[in-house]
Amino acid sequence: MTSLPLTPVNPDAPARRAAMPPRHLADFDLAGRQTLVTELGEPRFRARQVSTHYFGRLVRDPEQMTDLPAATREKLADQLLPTLLTPVRELACDDGATHKALWRLHDGSLVESVLMGYPDRVTVCLSSQAGCGMACPFCATGQAGLTRNLSTAEIVDQAVYLAGVAASGAVAGSPPRLSRVVFMGMGEPLANYNRVVAAIRRLVAPSPEGLGLSQRHITVSTVGLVPAIRRLASEDLSVTLALSLHAPDDELRDELVPVNQRWKVSEVLEAAWEYAARTGRRVSIEYAMIKDVNDQPWRADLLGRLLADRLAHVNLIPLNPTPGSRWDASPKPVEREFVRRLRAAGVSTTVRDTRGREIDGACGQLAAAEGP
C-alpha cells in the first residue's frame, strides 16, 4: 500500500463565521414557539396550529395554511417560516426509490440530502454542515472543506421536505411515512453538537411539537470525536451511534481518518463502548472497503479481535466512486472473505446496500455540486 500524506485536522476549529439563517419555528420547542407568537401579537394557540401544519401535515409554505388569517400568514412567513432551503435540483435513481435533493441556503452555501425508500420503510440521510472539516481523503464531502454549521431548522427542514416527498407517493414501492433518519450526509454531526441534538429532539417529539419518530430509528454518525460521544451518552436519548472506523490500526486510520491523530482507535472504541453501556444500544461500526488499502485478511482478524464480545455490528461499505479518487472498491471475493473472518470471530456483519450511486447520492459522494 502506498502511504498517504498525513492531513492534520483540528476537530475543535470553528466553522467559518457566517451569518446564520433567520429564526424558524423548528429552531424552538413548542413552549419557545408559543413565546414567539405572543411576541408577534398572536394568541398562544397559533403556535400549536402552525406546528400542526409544519410537522403534522408537512406544509412548509405559510400561504398553504389557509385556516390562518391572511395577515397572520404574512407575519408568520416573515418571522417564523422563512425560506431556509431553496431547491436547486432533485434527482432520482434506483427506479424511483432513491431521491437526492440539492439545496441552496440563504448565504449561497449548498447542501444535499437523500431519501431512500424500501418495501418496509423510508429513510432520509441528512446533512448537518455545509461541507466537512474532517478531511477524510476517500470522501468527496471531506475533500471540499468546511463552510459552516447548519442551524437546527436547516437540518429539520430537510427531513420535513423529504417526508413530504414520501407522503406524496413519489417513492416507488415504499410506505408513505418517513420512519428513519440517519445523520450521514454532509458534515460531522458531533462537530455541530448542540444543533444536531436539538434537531433530533424535534424529529422525535410527538406531533405537533415534532415529527414523532422513534429515537431508536435515528442514527448519528461520527468519525470519533471522543468528548462529544461521551456527551451524547449523557443525554436522555437512545439513538444509534455509528462510528466511522475504516481501519482497525492507528497507522492506517491516521491516514484515512485524520482525526485519529487526536483520538486513537483504542480511545474511540472505549468511548463507543461507554455509549453502548449507557444507552443499551448496539454501536454500528462503519468500514469502507478500499481495494488493497484496508481490506487485508489480517485487518479483518484484528478488527474481529477488537469487536468480539462487544455490543457492536459491522457495516461494510463498498467504496463509492468520487471524482479524482485514486481508490477502488474491494473486489467481491475479498469483501466476502472479510465478512467471513469477522463472522468467524463472532462479530455481526453486513454489507451496506449501495443506493444512489448513479446520482452521486451514496455514502461519501455528497459534494453539493451544481454541475450535471
Curated annotation (Swiss-Prot):
Q: What is its EC number?
A: 2.1.1.192
Cofactor(s) needed for function: [4Fe-4S] cluster
Q: Which CDD domains match?
A: Radical_SAM (cd01335)
Q: Does the keyword ATP-binding apply?
A: no
Look up the domain of life of the source: Bacteria
Could you say which enzyme class this protein belongs to?
Answer: transferase
Q: List the disulfide bonds.
A: 125-363
Family to which this protein belongs: Belongs to the radical SAM superfamily. RlmN family.
Name-wise, this protein is: Probable dual-specificity RNA methyltransferase RlmN
Organism of derivation: Salinispora tropica (strain ATCC BAA-916 / DSM 44818 / JCM 13857 / NBRC 105044 / CNB-440)
Q: Which gene encodes it?
A: rlmN
